[in-house]
Amino acid sequence: MQDLSGFSVPKGFRGGNAIKVQLWWAVQATIFAWSPQVLYRWRAFLLRLFGAKIGKNVVIRPSVKITYPWKLTLGDYAWVGDDVNLYTLGEITIGAHSVISQKSYLCTGSHDHASQHFTINATPIVIGEKCWLATDVFVAPGVTIGDGTVVGARSSVFKSLPANVVCRGNPAVVIRERVETE
């Protein structure tokens, strides 16, 4: 059984020193979160200032939560909706023209349940280009979602998904191919 008295965060795990982490959290809770909806470039600037790789014309809502922006890459024209949580203990990459809809949660971190000291770990998440994660989708550590894939509302993605398909469910399963109409 677990004994949390022996838990510790591995050295370098956060990717930044304690001052950088606390400064980001203060900025995120104030001038990032309080900025008007339309100030997408302002929020992109703040994220770049803290080491995020942000493409052009990215839409990031002010209520988005990002644990460590220096572990985030957003492609050109990516959209990140209201109340999305990007739990960047590990790297998160969101491809160009992809949409992460409101209340979705991308979780790169977990704990080893077999470890007595509940060891923390992180595995990257990659969302391909031209994807759409609909409202309230959960994406687990280590998942890759192929280019052009749609994940339906309130789905949970625990395994990687192929390109150009429509998926839904808990766990998410492929329903059909995604076919462009234009």
Curated annotation (Swiss-Prot):
Pfam family, one: Hexapep
Gene Ontology molecular-function annotations: O-acetyltransferase activity; O-acyltransferase activity
Top-level EC class: transferase
EC number: 2.3.1.-
GO annotation, biological process: colanic acid biosynthetic process; lipopolysaccharide biosynthetic process; single-species biofilm formation; slime layer polysaccharide biosynthetic process
Gene3D superfamilies: Hexapeptide repeat proteins
Domain of life: Bacteria
InterPro entries per the UniProt record, alphabetical: Colanic_acid_synth_WcaF, Hexapep, Hexapep_transf_CS, Hexapeptide_acetyltransf, Trimer_LpxA-like_sf
Keywords: Acyltransferase, Lipopolysaccharide biosynthesis, Repeat, Transferase
Pathway the protein acts in: Slime biogenesis; slime polysaccharide biosynthesis
Family statement: Belongs to the transferase hexapeptide repeat family.
NCBIfam families: PRK10502.1, WcaF
Stated name of the protein: Putative colanic acid biosynthesis acetyltransferase WcaF
Annotated organism of origin: Escherichia coli (strain K12)
